[in-house]
Curated annotation (Swiss-Prot):
The lineage of its organism: Bacteria, Pseudomonadati, Pseudomonadota, Gammaproteobacteria, Pasteurellales. It is found in: Cytoplasm. It comes from Mannheimia succiniciproducens (strain KCTC 0769BP / MBEL55E). Monomer. Belongs to the RNase H family. Endonuclease that specifically degrades the RNA of RNA-DNA hybrids. Pfam families: RNase_H. This is Ribonuclease H. Mg(2+) 1 binds at D14, E52, D74.
Length: 158
């Protein structure tokens, strides 16, 4: 039996918000071999955490087939949520440990769905530390936030 080699993809993501809540943006750098693709999107009213999640969802949704992904993000919230917390949230019908509904459930469900086809190695990157791709994602996210064109469907003010 042989194993089909999946494409090795590197993804870098960042989310940004001008005010929290406020206008927000996402920045994505997707790399396959020597090819690099970037994505910048802006949303009218949202939060920083929603942008961190949405950046990863949009990045994974760009992939056309199951891939082996190394995903770099400076968001502990996103990384811990998808690698640790989500299992209990799902068991408890999307309730947090305090018994309240999980914040950003719509995006957590979308992220959970987006990761299923891929093998993902989650890497945390220290933000604003001179990491080239993270800095580029930060710029792309800020550009998006400064020029919002999209509605963050699912955003609910506290």
């Amino acid at each position: 039996m042989y194993q089909i080699m999946r494409k090795q993809i590197e993804i870098f993501t960042d989310g940004s918000c001008l005010g929290n809540p406020g206008a927000g943006g996402i920045g994505v750098v997707l790399r396959y071999k020597q090819h690099e693709k970037t994505l910048s999107q802006g949303y009218f009213k949202t939060t920083n955490n929603r942008m961190e999640l949405r950046a990863v969802i949009e990045a994974l949704n760009l992939l056309k087939e199951p891939c082996a992904v190394t995903l770099h993000s400076d968001s502990q919230y996103m990384k811990n949520g998808i690698t640790q917390w989500i299992f209990n949230w799902k068991k408890k019908n999307w309730k947090a440990s305090n018994g309240k509904p999980v914040k950003n459930q719509d995006l957590w469900m979308a992220l959970d769905n987006a990761v299923q086809a891929h093998t993902i190695d989650w890497r945390w990157v220290k933000g604003h530390s001179g990491h080239r791709e993270n800095e580029l994602c930060d710029q792309l996210a800020k550009q998006g936030a400064e020029n919002p064109t999209l509605e963050d469907i699912g955003y609910q003010p506290d």
